[in-house]
From Swiss-Prot:
<keyword id="KW-0547">Nucleotide-binding</keyword>
<dbReference type="GO" id="GO:0008556">
    <property type="term" value="F:P-type potassium transmembrane transporter activity"/>
</dbReference>
<keyword id="KW-0406">Ion transport</keyword>
<dbReference type="GO" id="GO:0005886">
    <property type="term" value="C:plasma membrane"/>
</dbReference>
<keyword id="KW-0633">Potassium transport</keyword>
<dbReference type="InterPro" id="IPR003820">
    <property type="entry name" value="KdpC"/>
</dbReference>
<keyword id="KW-0630">Potassium</keyword>
<comment type="subunit">
    <text>The system is composed of three essential subunits: KdpA, KdpB and KdpC.</text>
</comment>
<keyword id="KW-0812">Transmembrane</keyword>
<protein>
    <recommendedName>
        <fullName>Potassium-transporting ATPase KdpC subunit</fullName>
    </recommendedName>
</protein>
<keyword id="KW-0067">ATP-binding</keyword>
<keyword id="KW-0813">Transport</keyword>
<comment type="function">
    <text>Part of the high-affinity ATP-driven potassium transport (or Kdp) system, which catalyzes the hydrolysis of ATP coupled with the electrogenic transport of potassium into the cytoplasm. This subunit acts as a catalytic chaperone that increases the ATP-binding affinity of the ATP-hydrolyzing subunit KdpB by the formation of a transient KdpB/KdpC/ATP ternary complex.</text>
</comment>
<comment type="similarity">
    <text>Belongs to the KdpC family.</text>
</comment>
<dbReference type="Pfam" id="PF02669">
    <property type="entry name" value="KdpC"/>
</dbReference>
<keyword id="KW-1003">Cell membrane</keyword>
<keyword id="KW-1133">Transmembrane helix</keyword>
Length: 193
């Protein structure tokens, strides 16, 4: 019995020590460093309005349906962050074809002056997560005519807005040029006032 206690005692102490180190000390240190070095990222890259209220995140897409605003990618999960994911249909899957056709029909209704052949793929397909906050600059540009017509903001102004909001590839190497739809729409909203 004494031998069992002599073996269990160090096991319990080591377990408790690592529980405290890995469960409390390490997370607190990492959180402290993150808050000190990159507070914006550590807090979720939140975007605030003029009243200092959180209206979204740079990292999570939102569903914009008002024709006065730029629209983002299609989301099969309706931008619900807790259900991140996509159906990941194969290109030959009939369900994918139906969903893309539905997206194209919606596009035609909202943008009758833009031929379907000019619609970038990112406006009719969803991303792997279903939460993508960005679209390509071309996807933003093909929406300019609709927005200009509704808001009476000149096309040149809208194109410049897209150019100003375009972010390059990470480190100039990874990914594509992209436009964050929420940030773009916030700047557009300022022009509408």
């Amino acid at each position: 019995m004494a031998k069992k206690q002599s073996i269990l005692s160090p096991i319990i102490r080591i377990t408790f020590t690592f529980l405290v180190l890995c469960g409390l000390v390490y997370p607190l240190i990492v959180t402290g460093i993150a808050q000190a070095v990159m507070k914006d990222n550590a807090d979720g890259s939140l975007i605030y309005n003029d009243k200092n209220e959180v209206i979204g995140s740079k990292l999570i897409g939102q569903n914009f349906t008002d024709p006065r605003y730029f629209h983002g990618r299609v989301s099969s999960i309706e931008y619900k962050a807790e259900a991140s994911g996509s159906n990941n249909y194969a290109p030959s899957n009939p369900d994918l074809e139906k969903r893309v056709e539905k997206s194209i029909e919606e596009w035609k209704k909202q943008n009758p002056s833009v031929p379907v052949t000019e619609v970038p793929i990112d406006l009719v397909t969803n991303s792997g997560s279903g939460l993508d906050p960005d679209i390509s600059p071309k996807a933003a540009s093909v929406q300019v005519e609709r927005i200009s017509k509704i808001t009476n903001i000149p096309k040149e102004t809208l194109n410049q807005l897209i150019k100003d909001q375009t972010e390059g590839a990470a480190l100039g190497l990874f990914g594509e040029n992209r436009v964050n739809v929420l940030k773009l729409n916030l700047e557009l909203q300022k022009l509408m006032k």
